[in-house]
Design a protein with these regions (language model features):
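Accessory, usually C-terminal, subdomains that scaffold auxiliary metal cofactors
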Residues: 243-250, 254-263
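Residue-level marker of structural boundaries
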Residues: 90, 256-257, 269
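Short S/T/G/P-rich N-terminal loop/turn motif that feeds into the first structured element of a domain
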Residues: 1-235, 247, 277-280
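Active-site scaffold segments
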Residues: 236-241
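Charge-dense polyanion-binding interfaces
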Residues: 262-280
């Protein structure tokens, strides 16, 4: 393992995006549990604001199970990050690390809570429809946006009773690619506007929520021993919360979701999806 400062040099940040609070998303690979405990204790002593800390379980979309932890940390401003960067607090032994600078884009809670009022409808469709349909079109072959059948079956058979958090890294196509060549819209319009809104509603109706949504600013600030699955440039991160892991594969039970998949496929270039639980 290597002693690495997991906090980036503030000079690497894009100034126009970081006039106030700075939010970092950090992937870590740590196999020594004692190191993880020490990090958490040190961060607590220094009043570092950890918005979320996730224990990574396994990869749903991607080639390998790799990361052990995922953190979202907020700093008051660039000066606050500068102080922490210069201190020894961030220098830890890690096998791998990847850090992104993100701009939060969370939806208003008032709107989310309004959608939750319609959950009984979602529970009804969940009861009357089978999950088997969701596996029919999955294959054990390479895909940048779908799990393999083996990965999906692992998720369906997951016995954990903890809430499941699905961490998504997203890269969109510049222009959406439909079979109907007369459709000319951007990848963002296809994925976010046409697919994303329906997916969001479906997650909420199935009893879920969204722990975090944000736009990734620039390239990775730190990338050491990162796997091919997460290397490179990403545009957004979304973390969906489900009452149980298998719920991610039951979204098609909600009316309207299946019709939106054509827009997901047209607009999404690459997706990394990781199943995680909350570190408490």
């Amino acid at each position: 393992m290597n002693l690495i400062n997991i906090f980036p040099d503030p000079s690497k940040l894009i100034d126009i995006e970081n006039t106030n609070k700075i939010v970092l998303f950090i992937f870590l690979k740590i196999t020594d549990i004692s190191i993880k405990k020490n990090i958490k204790n040190d961060f607590f002593k220094e009043n570092i604001n950890i918005l979320h800390w996730f224990d990574c379980q396994y990869t749903n979309i991607g080639k390998e199970d790799f990361w052990s932890d995922a953190l979202i940390i907020e700093f008051k401003n660039k000066n606050n990050l500068q102080e922490i960067y210069k201190s020894e607090i961030g220098r830890i032994n890690v096998e791998a690390i990847q850090v992104f600078n993100i701009f939060p884009k969370n939806l208003p809670r008032l709107f989310v809570n309004f959608l939750k009022l319609f959950r009984p409808i979602g529970f009804f469709f969940e009861m009357i429809k089978s999950t088997k349909k969701e596996l029919q079109n999955l294959k054990n072959s390479d895909s940048n946006i779908l799990p393999t059948k083996i990965q999906a079956e692992r998720l369906l058979n997951e016995k954990s009773t903890k809430k499941a958090y699905m961490i998504n890294l997203l890269e969109l196509k510049e222009m959406a690619q439909y079979k109907d060549k007369s459709i000319s819209i951007t990848g963002r319009e296809a994925y976010v506007e046409k697919y994303g809104k329906q997916a969001f509603k479906s997650v909420i109706l199935l009893g879920g929520d969204f722990a975090f949504n944000g736009r990734i600013i620039g390239d990775s600030l730190i990338e050491h021993n990162a796997p091919l699955d997460t290397q490179g440039k990403w545009q957004a991160i979304g973390i969906a919360e489900y009452t149980k892991p298998r719920k991610m594969l039951e979204l098609e039970k909600i009316p309207g979701y299946s019709k939106g998949l054509i827009h997901r496929d047209a607009g999404l270039k690459r997706n990394y999806n990781l199943y995680a639980t909350k570190n408490t």
